[in-house]
């Protein structure tokens, strides 16, 4: 096979051209901006991260460049010291372009050279920016207006402007359906609901079910080009926090579904797995620690979540193992205790419709603040089948001081006990006080870590709910 000199020269220059076009090169000119540095940041999750900071060149421009292409997403040019940001799109195909604007009006005078995607993006933003103030004004007027002809007129005007925006949007997305700009813009859109029939309660339920079903219509979980936009995180967290039934089983299934979709992308999988692991490590809602245990067992112990710190991984796994026997729905660990008279008994031997176990200490500030509420709770619930068991968490030599504190403050009416060997401490993972567990007759945990101020209200609701479900 013969290769001519001309062909070799062509191949050489073609290869150099390809190499020259590899990576990214974004040149920025901001008229009136004379600061030494300009920063390029990107979205990921619910935060922005700095990609690079460059110095002003001799020509007054700022050039961001690198041999490895940028991952697609919404990036932000950040001016100092005001931290004013200018958003721009970076797609897989457009990594080399120029940006021009003015410091005094960075958004109004924003122009792009060599980036069709950003031209489309700005076209959409300008249109929406023009109509949004009008929509906001009409919505405010509609909200303030009393029922009548005036309100109906405002409603019609609102519908007309909204219809104009929607028509433009749908046409924009249709014409530019293959563009990255259209993908990003669509991901920012809220769900539009059909009209639902039925009672107000039925309409609310249908709306919620529709939102859950269509949550990822505009933000497909497998569309990883949207990872570096704020819309991806918003869709994922809205689905879990607002559109799932807030019960551990439902949340576990929902997070499993999300992570399964994200598996092909290691960065996304690790980020959201760790995000939810942290969220449910210290949940705000009682019983949701079961989600943490599930995630730790399913993804951490199996090695699917990659943590750079082995010690942290081991600690989280250990925490899950300690929490698992204490989850709501589990039978409370049986423990041997001694009452103030020296009589030994087992927790499971207590005969009562409900047992409230409080592990406390006389020198614990939080316990001291909570004790009056425990007393009030006991007085109101002692005749409703609730037994209060207070377990003093102190060494044997301090028990006399503990009992004196009980007597001096009038807390002796309910059952008090101790275990100088601290055998309960491991079983109930006592690393701080107070610890609170509500159990039913069979000593199944039905509530835990109930704050003293809300104890009467929460336990009354639990008891009432259990009565209805019988």
Language-model features and meaning:
Residues 345-374, 387-389:
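Short active-site neighborhood of thiol/selenol oxidoreductases, capturing the structured segment around
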Residues 206-273:
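Structured, charged N-terminal subsegments at the starts of enzyme catalytic cores
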Residues 369-407, 420-426:
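Structural microenvironment flanking redox-active thiols in thiol-disulfide oxidoreductases
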Residues 282-338, 348-349, 400, 404:
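N-proximal helix/coil linker or "cap" segments that precede and/or mark the start of modular domains
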Residues 1-29, 466, 470:
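Bacterial Sec-dependent N-terminal signal peptides
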Residues 20-177, 184-215:
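A non-transmembrane, solvent-exposed segment enriched in polar/low-complexity residues
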Residues 175-180, 266, 306:
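Short solvent-exposed coil/turn linkers within tandem alpha-helical repeat scaffolds
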